[in-house]
Amino acid sequence: MPTIQQLVRSARTRLSKKTKSPALKSCPQRRGVCTRVYTTTPKKPNSALRKVARVRLTSGFEVTAYIPGIGHNLQEHSVVLVRGGRVKDLPGVRYHIVRGTLDSAGVKDRSQSRSKYGVKRPK
C-alpha cells in the first residue's frame, strides 16, 4: 500500500485494454480483397468444413475472416467488408465477412435473421 506522498510523486499507471480486432484500427468495418478462399476444420469436439477467406485489408493487414451462412459466391479478388467478431472453434479467425455488401451476396432463401445475412424482405 503506497503512501499519499508516493502517489503524489508518481500516479498509478492505468491498465491499457488490448483490442480484440487490431487490424480494423478502431473502425467498425474495413474493406478488403480476398487473397484465398478455402475451408478449415474446427477444434476438437466439433467437426465440419468451415468456410474462411484470407483478406488483405485497406489498413495493410492480412487477416483470416469467416464467411457466415450457407453457400457463398466469394472467390479470389472479391472485394468484401470485414467486421470484428471471432469464431470460437476456429483458432486465429477473429473477423467476419459482412454478407450482402460489396461483392459478397446475401444468403439464398433465408427467411429468419435476414439482417445478419444481407437478405432483403421477401415480397
Swiss-Prot record:
A GO term for molecular function: structural constituent of ribosome
Keyword Chloroplast found: yes
Gene3D superfamilies cross-referenced by the UniProt entry: Nucleic acid-binding proteins (2.40.50.140)
A GO BP entry: translation
Top-level taxonomic group: Eukaryota
Name of a matching Pfam family: Ribosom_S12_S23
Localization, UniProt: Plastid, Chloroplast
A Gene Ontology term for the protein's cellular component: small ribosomal subunit
SUPFAM superfamilies linked: Nucleic acid-binding proteins
Keyword Transmembrane helix: no
CDD domains, sorted: Ribosomal_S12 (cd03368)
Keywords recorded for this protein, A-Z: Chloroplast, Plastid, Ribonucleoprotein, Ribosomal protein, RNA-binding, rRNA-binding
The family this protein is said to belong to: Belongs to the universal ribosomal protein uS12 family.
Subunit structure: Part of the 30S ribosomal subunit.
Function field: With S4 and S5 plays an important role in translational accuracy. Located at the interface of the 30S and 50S subunits.
Listed name of the protein: Small ribosomal subunit protein uS12c
UniProt organism field: Chlorella vulgaris
Encoding gene, per UniProt annotation: rps12
